A protein has these predicted regions:
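A short acidic, Gly/Pro-enriched loop at the edge of an enzyme's catalytic core
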Residues: 92-104
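Receiver (REC) domain switch-region micro-motif
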Residues: 49, 104, 109
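Glycine-rich helix-loop-beta junction characteristic of Rossmann-like nucleotide cofactor-binding loops
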Residues: 41-46, 94-95
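Short catalytic/ligand-binding loop motif for oxyanion handling, primarily in non-cytosolic enzymes
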Residues: 37, 56-61, 78-80, 95, ...
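Class I SAM-dependent methyltransferase SAM/SAH-binding core
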Residues: 50-93
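Class I SAM-dependent methyltransferase Rossmann-like catalytic core
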Residues: 1-43
Length: 214
């Protein structure tokens, strides 16, 4: 799988859901999010892991690694995950040890009011050299405009210029993409007939970027 690309169509949702089940991972209850998980979970390497925005984390329970696992969110899930330390706090100011983590994941979070500059700076502070950051997000191009909220937070579906800005900020902070971005998009997979928030009137897809710390 490419690690810097976009969800193209429903067939990819079906294929990645099957992939997770066949490889011993439990799939997400929102099936299109299995596209994110199927890219990230097999690629995670041994070492400390932090899921940034872990309220409904399918990463932490699925990650088959030896090493400490942490999650941070302003709102914690109402359950515990065996072997995982869950922290209530700001993912842009985690107060966790510097250069400690091998892997950071941030799944469908940065479109909800996250400051890209503060986020990138904190990720660089947390990652070991050679450690990876996986970021997924809601996406459509051209830009979907208008004021939207979801989960009580601002909801900014990213467009190409937004993503290019995020990449530039991350690179300036000290992380590089693991490969060139495949900017092609096909279908607005997430729509009112398939998992878009009820009444939102928007249609979009998912994107994934993978960075490595210098």
């Amino acid at each position: 799988m490419k690690m810097c690309e976009f969800l193209q169509d429903r067939s990819q949702v079906d294929a990645t859901t099957t992939f997770l089940s066949q490889h011993g991972f439990y799939p997400h209850s929102i099936t299109p999010k299995n596209w994110d998980l199927a890219h990230i979970l097999p690629d995670i390497t041994e070492g400390p892991l932090l899921d940034m925005g872990c309220c409904e984390s399918y990463i932490l329970g699925n990650a088959k690694i030896i090493g400490p696992k942490f999650g941070i969110d302003m709102r914690l899930p109402g359950y515990t995950i065996p072997g995982v330390t869950l922290l209530q706090g700001d993912l842009m100011d985690t107060r966790l040890p510097p250069k400690y983590f091998q892997t950071l994941t941030c799944i469908s979070v940065i479109e909800h009011g996250v400051d890209f500059g503060r986020f990138a700076a904190e990720c660089v502070r947390l990652l070991r050299p050679g450690g990876k950051l996986y970021v997924s997000f809601d996406y459509w191009n051209p830009k979907i405009t208008g004021t939207m909220n979801l989960y009580g937070l601002a909801w900014n579906i990213l467009c190409r210029s937004d993503v290019e800005g995020l990449i530039q900020i991350c690179e300036k902070a000290g992380m590089m993409l693991t490969e060139e971005v495949d900017w092609s998009i096909k279908d607005a997979v997430i729509n009112e007939a398939f998992y878009a928030p009820r009444g939102s009137g928007v249609a979009y897809t998912f994107g994934l970027l993978t960075f490595v710390a210098k």
